[in-house]
């Protein structure tokens, strides 16, 4: 249903920008977060705010929300200055912060009441508004449930409802799609488009460029500077004619991508199923005229990577010197070894894994195997049972039934010994926020049982590799997101495990950071490391050799990314994406 947006008496002229910033500077001590940017937010549209970690996106949103004062320059929202004129502007602005801004120990209804109190809504107004918002978000059956017990998609809806309590004319969304599955993101877009149709202006900050492509306009920030202001299509057009798809030999997509990145003429190369997407440098197109290179339409991510300097090249220092986890020839991919290694034991094996919580079955007879050098993806909607399966495989949760082994060790009989052979990078990165970077490295080295000499060597190597030296004394919770990710990967790999479990490892990071991360992971597979990953980001799932799709605790599909896409190909959808396959397969089961 559409959500009515009440008109206001002081509506601005139709062409007046919903917000504008002029020569805007915001500094925190010696750190310049925004360096003199000027831009206008068109009314009645969705504007995407993109840029790498530390670009200044959240700072800009907080300035627009009236939560900060600029160091210099000006901010206008709905024709007025935030934090001035009796808070009128803030009353007409809705703000949904990262992680949705919810109080997880309060119920859905209590969260709504808390935000209604902050908006000073009287009893009549909140009764009407609650009824509208609960219908709009489909949360009416869950008003008594604690926010912390909601799925990611339901938390997202509740965060949006809280931001909409004041019937805002400007809605500020700070990475609303992080940590939620494609079905939930699609539902969020439906709701936001309805709001825009009713006259609301939306600023949508995102690390996912396919989300930004849906926006009417984008602002691209980097290091506090505005690099681009305009329609996303115009930015994508800058690389038209320079984007190609190269079909890789069977099982060699990772090696093909790495080969492309060694070429001086290549700006970017990423895996897409059994193919590699290649972006050529200007004036180098003639080098890609062979039959193996098929021209394809550009996308925003291609232009974004070019504008920020291209993908990082060179060998992964993390993989150098890594002890081989299995008898795997250096550089060979999982599929190349599959025939020769068919008789070898899987490094990860799950058979009939089941976990019940009372009458609720969170995981229902889940089974799969992962061999040395293979990347296996566990995909599914929020609440499908992925994290439960993950925790059982890591020895953190005892199965109700079934068996699991890691690196040849049975988790039911020797969970602690199995945990010593795996690395686990959990959601939110498993770091101890009140410990410093150095203390986190020291702690994880100790719990993994490294000798004093090995600990000294490995910790020093990680500090150099991930450029952590300037942050060693900083508390982990205060690190920028990209450095939290680096530290988490360092802690998970200090002991050179045979198996890596990655639970949404790049959630919320930009494409360049994602490429850096997967550059290391792909290199580790050449050393025989087996990888199991969960992700809600379908472009990332393309890096997997095989995918298991989980829904309501059961594995409903398994195959390569291309095999899953082929299952939903039709005349109406001749070139389905992995997100198309995800949604179609889930909806097919739900029908």
Question: What is each residue range found by the language model?
Answer:
Residues 65, 394:
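Helix-to-loop junction immediately C-terminal to a conserved catalytic motif
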Residues 73-84, 88-89, 402-410, 417-418:
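Conserved ABC transporter NBD signature motif
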Residues 113, 117, 124-142, 442, ...:
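Conserved ABC ATPase "signature" region
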Residues 171-175, 500-503:
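Catalytic Walker B motif of ABC-type/P-loop ATPase nucleotide-binding domains
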Residues 190-281, 517-533, 538-591:
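ABC transporter nucleotide-binding domain
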């Amino acid at each position: 249903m559409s959500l009515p947006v009440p008109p206001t008496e002081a509506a601005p002229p139709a062409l007046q920008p919903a917000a504008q910033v002029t020569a805007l500077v915001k500094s925190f001590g010696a750190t310049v977060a925004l360096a003199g940017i000027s831009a206008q937010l068109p009314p009645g549209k969705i504007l995407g705010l993109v840029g790498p970690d530390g670009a200044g996106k959240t700072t800009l949103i907080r300035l627009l929300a009236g939560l900060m004062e600029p160091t210099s320059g000006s901010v206008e929202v709905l024709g007025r200055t935030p934090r001035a004129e009796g808070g009128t502007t803030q009353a007409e602005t809705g703000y949904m912060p990262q992680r949705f801004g919810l109080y997880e120990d309060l119920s859905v209804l209590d969260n709504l009441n808390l935000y209604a109190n902050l908006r000073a809504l009287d009893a009549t107004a909140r009764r009407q508004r609650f009824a509208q918002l609960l219908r709009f978000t489909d949360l009416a059956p869950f008003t008594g449930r604690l926010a912390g017990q909601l799925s990611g998609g339901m938390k997202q809806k509740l965060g949006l409802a809280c931001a909409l309590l004041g019937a805002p004319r400007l809605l500020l969304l700070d990475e609303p799609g992080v940590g939620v599955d494609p079905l939930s993101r699609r539902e969020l877009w439906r709701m936001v488009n309805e709001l825009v149709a009713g006259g609301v202006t939306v600023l949508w900050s995102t690390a996912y460029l396919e989300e930004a492509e849906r926006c009417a306009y984008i602002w691209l920030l980097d290091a506090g500077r505005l690099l681009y202001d305009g329609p996303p299509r115009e930015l994508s057009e800058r690389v038209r004619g320079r984007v190609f798809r190269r079909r890789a030999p069977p099982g060699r997509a990772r090696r093909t991508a790495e080969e492309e990145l060694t070429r001086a003429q290549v700006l970017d190369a990423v895996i897409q199923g059994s193919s590699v997407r290649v972006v050529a440098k200007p004036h180098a197109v003639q080098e890609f005229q062979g039959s193996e290179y098929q021209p394809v339409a550009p996308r925003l991510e291609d232009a974004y990577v070019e504008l920020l300097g291209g993908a990082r090249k060179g060998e992964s220092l993390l993989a150098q010197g890594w002890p081989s986890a299995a008898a795997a020839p250096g550089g060979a991919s999982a599929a190349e070894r599959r025939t020769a290694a068919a008789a070898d034991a899987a490094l990860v094996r799950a058979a009939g894994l089941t976990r019940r919580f009372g009458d609720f079955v969170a995981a229902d007879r889940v089974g799969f195997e992962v061999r040395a050098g293979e990347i296996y993806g566990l995909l599914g909607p929020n609440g499908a049972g992925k994290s439960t399966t993950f925790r059982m495989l890591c020895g953190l949760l005892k199965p109700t039934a079934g068996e699991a082994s890691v690196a040849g060790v049975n988790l039911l009989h020797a969970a602690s010994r199995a945990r010593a052979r795996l690395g686990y990078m959990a959601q939110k990165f498993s770091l101890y926020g009140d410990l410093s970077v150095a203390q986190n490295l020291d702690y994880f080295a100790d719990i993994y049982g490294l000798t004093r000499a090995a600990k000294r060597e490995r910790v020093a190597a990680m500090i150099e590799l991930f450029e952590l030296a300037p942050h060693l004394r900083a508390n982990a919770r205060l690190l920028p997101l990209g450095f939290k990710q680096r530290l988490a990967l360092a802690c998970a790999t200090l002991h050179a495990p045979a198996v890596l479990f990655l639970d949404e490892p790049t959630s919320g990071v930009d494409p360049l950071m994602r490429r850096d991360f997967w550059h290391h992971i792909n290199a580790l597979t050449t050393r025989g490391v087996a990888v199991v990953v969960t992700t809600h980001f379908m472009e990332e799932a393309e890096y997997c050799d095989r995918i298991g799709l989980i829904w309501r605790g059961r594995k409903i599909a398994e195959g390569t990314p291309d095999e899953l896409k082929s299952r939903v190909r039709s005349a109406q959808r001749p070139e389905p994406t992995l997100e198309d396959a995800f949604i179609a397969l889930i909806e097919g089961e739900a029908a």
